Amino acid sequence: MIRPILKMGDSRLLRVAKPVQRFQTPELTALIEDMFDTMDAARGAGLAAPQIGVDLQVVIFGFDRNDRYPDAPAVPKTVLINPTIEPLSDAMEDGWEGCLSVPGLRGVVPRYTRLRYTGYDQHGHAIDRIAEGFHARVVQHECDHLQGILYPMRVQDFTRFGFTEILFPELPAHHND
């Protein structure tokens, strides 16, 4: 089921999410299915449970190709529950980000270029992966949602933050959301 996506300004997006306590429950399974339905319908690269009003540490991400980020490499489809992130170096890179909860805007955000993320899949099996580049950026962006952080809070240079249609006029109109 496609759920409504909360938008910046909704105070629920600023809450810290709670860890998932039980895996393989009908409720968790339904939540994850709804998250994928919602992300796919919105053509997103990822989605965090708080974006649909659920205060649980659940994020999903991944795509083969994403028309909102046409130059981005594929990212493996992942369900990540109760995640932790460990940067593998101090190296950071600026990159453009958008968000389904901040429609029509893009901004440049510094992110760690290489990291290790751990957590669990929907069955409670451990996940332990190394990510770099856009994959690492997506993981950090989605996990920020679990701490009540939206990407504009990380923008450092507001001359590089604005409406997608102005910043990227070459993108078709449907890329602006």
Swiss-Prot record:
Signal peptide from the UniProt entry: none
Catalytic activity: N-terminal N-formyl-L-methionyl-[peptide] + H2O = N-terminal L-methionyl-[peptide] + formate
Residues at the active site: E142
Cofactor: how bound: Binds 1 Fe(2+) ion.
Cofactor: Fe(2+)
NCBIfam families: pept_deformyl (TIGR00079), PRK00150.1-3 (NF001159)
Protein name: Peptide deformylase 2
The organism of origin for this protein: Ralstonia nicotianae (strain ATCC BAA-1114 / GMI1000) (Ralstonia solanacearum)
